[in-house]
């Protein structure tokens, strides 16, 4: 079956995990290039061993590769700052861009929430690993209630799974995730916190989601959450609730003070998640890699399927 060649810029943890997923699991994509800036990186060495064209000269090196003209889709797994530069060049060259950094130049995309709604945009943004894991839960509460006043997420990932790109983007992570909690999650106000856990042996990715909502019943909220978990599990099998959803009534007689909002009452929902990785590159504790790369692959595969249909027509 014909496949569309793609390139990955960024040979770190996320880029390498994505490469392995494409080679093992993609229905409509094939690796055309792996791009890095460190000639000694494990990702480039692994790509070369697997027969993938490689360059350690960044995007300039990618453009020099003889098969660059055949590459239709480029995944950027570098950093928010680098993506701005890379995207400008790739758009001029007519490439479809999947952004795995928190740069958020293109529209936010979380497959379980907005599916293929942005599939034809020249650049789509995959939010962040914490956003991919938690924002579906905020959305699940929102669709079962009249309003979600506050959505707050805490993403705890193993320090070992966070490469230099992730560490350089902590501020962008919190800003982009907070914004996406509001835009995709439907919360009126969003807040995001990331924790790099240095524990040894490394701990699996854990996420906690807090919402304060009005309207809707506990039963309808819980069912909506379970349905959303099932939707995410279709492309991330290791995604699951860590324990039963917790509820707490915040009455008018004892309201909570929300920053920038004031005193509020409603139903507080606490959702605890665990994301186990598929261990394609790093071990299973790195669920943060898995949920990000799986979401990007699903979106790209759907786009590639559409392109192949157009070419066949």
UniProtKB/Swiss-Prot annotation:
EC numbers, comma separated: 1.2.1.10
GO biological process: catabolic process
Residues bound to NAD(+): 11-14, 161-169, 288
Family matches, as CDD domains: ALDH_C
Keyword Hydrolase: no
Keyword Oxidoreductase: yes
Top-level enzyme category: oxidoreductase
Alphabetized InterPro entries for the sequence: Acetaldehyde_dehydrogenase, Acetylaldehyde_DH_C, NAD(P)-bd_dom_sf, Semialdehyde_DH_NAD-bd
GO molecular function, one term: NAD binding
Key words of the record: Aromatic hydrocarbons catabolism, NAD, Oxidoreductase
Active site: 129 (acyl-thioester intermediate)
Residues annotated as transmembrane: none
Catalytic reaction(s) noted: acetaldehyde + NAD(+) + CoA = acetyl-CoA + NADH + H(+)
Similarity remark: Belongs to the acetaldehyde dehydrogenase family.
Protein name, entry field: Acetaldehyde dehydrogenase
């Amino acid at each position: 079956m014909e496949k569309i060649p793609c390139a990955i810029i960024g040979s770190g943890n996320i880029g390498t995990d994505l490469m392995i997923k494409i080679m093992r699991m993609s229905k409509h994509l094939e690796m055309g290039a792996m791009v890095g800036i460190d000639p000694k990186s494990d990702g480039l060495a692994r790509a070369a061993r697997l027969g993938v064209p490689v360059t350690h000269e960044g995007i300039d090196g990618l453009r020099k590769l003889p098969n660059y003209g055949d590459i239709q889709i480029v995944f950027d797994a570098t950093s928010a700052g680098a993506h701005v530069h890379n995207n400008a060049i790739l758009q001029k060259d007519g490439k479809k861009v999947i952004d795995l950094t928190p740069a958020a130049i293109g529209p936010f995309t979380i497959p379980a929430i907005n599916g293929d709604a942005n599939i034809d945009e020249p650049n789509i943004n995959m939010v962040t690993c914490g956003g991919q894991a938690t924002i579906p839960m905020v959305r699940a509460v929102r669709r079962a209630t009249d309003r979600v006043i506050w959505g707050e997420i805490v993403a705890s990932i193993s320090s070992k799974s966070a490469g230099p790109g992730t560490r350089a983007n902590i501020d962008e992570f919190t800003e982009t995730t907070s914004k996406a909690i509001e835009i995709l999650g439907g919360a009126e106000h969003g807040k995001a916190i990331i924790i790099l856990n240095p524990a040894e042996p490394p701990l699996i990715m854990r996420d906690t989601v807090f919402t304060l909502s009005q309207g809707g019943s506990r039963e309808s909220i819980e069912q909506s959450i379970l349905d959303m978990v099932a939707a995410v599990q279709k492309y991330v099998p290791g995604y699951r609730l860590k324990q039963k959803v917790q509820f707490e009534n915040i009455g008018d007689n004892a309201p909570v003070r929300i920053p920038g909002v004031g005193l509020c009452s409603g139903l507080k929902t606490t959702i605890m998640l665990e994301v186990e990785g598929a261990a394609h590159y790093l071990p299973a504790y790195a669920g943060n890699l898995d949920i990000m790369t799986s979401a990007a692959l699903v979106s790209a595969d759907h786009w590639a399927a559409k392109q192949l249909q157009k070419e066949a027509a």
